[in-house]
Amino acid sequence: MVLQTDQTPDPRQLAIIAEQLGRAPRGIEAVAAVDGEGTPLVLRMAPIVDGKPFPTLYWLSCTRLKVVISRLEASGVIKQLETRLQEDPDFLAAYHASHHDYVDARWHHMRDAQRREVAHLGYEEVLTRRGIGGIANWDQVRCLHTQYAHHLCGDNVIGQWMDAEHGVVDCLP
């Protein structure tokens, strides 16, 4: 089960996240999604971390999901998806819509002070043109982890496909 939360992490969640990442988290704004036991699955990140744009709005933190998705990547699924994007105009259009959803969410979650910082640092164009996980070419798939993190928090056709074809969500409690 996946619950979208978008809440500031509590001390228990911060400890779990540090264990998941192998370090203390930097740039985390919220726990965006948890599983049925309340374990963080996805973190929502700040748009600027250490004075630079952070390309990933949604960060997949769940160890279980990372393992399952890494196996999919190792099996060559990204190449399969990119072939489908080239051959299926409807799938490509849905994928472009996923990128737009991601960019819109990035700007929606920015506070006024963050928007001013983004403008001051000259990163408005980068954070508007870069899609899921910071990818520039919206016809390619870079990382299934970022696709799936977005799927759990937004509208992502790749994540939907991963659930339909590979049952990724079924690994969660």
Model-predicted regions and their roles:
Residues 1-46, 50:
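Short N-terminal edge-element motif at the start of the domain
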Residues 34-88:
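Aromatic- and glycine-enriched beta-alpha-beta binding-site module
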Residues 65-122:
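An exposed acidic His-Trp-rich patch
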Residues 14, 74-78, 141:
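Alpha-helix initiation and N-capping motif
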Residues 107-173:
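C-terminal charged interaction modules
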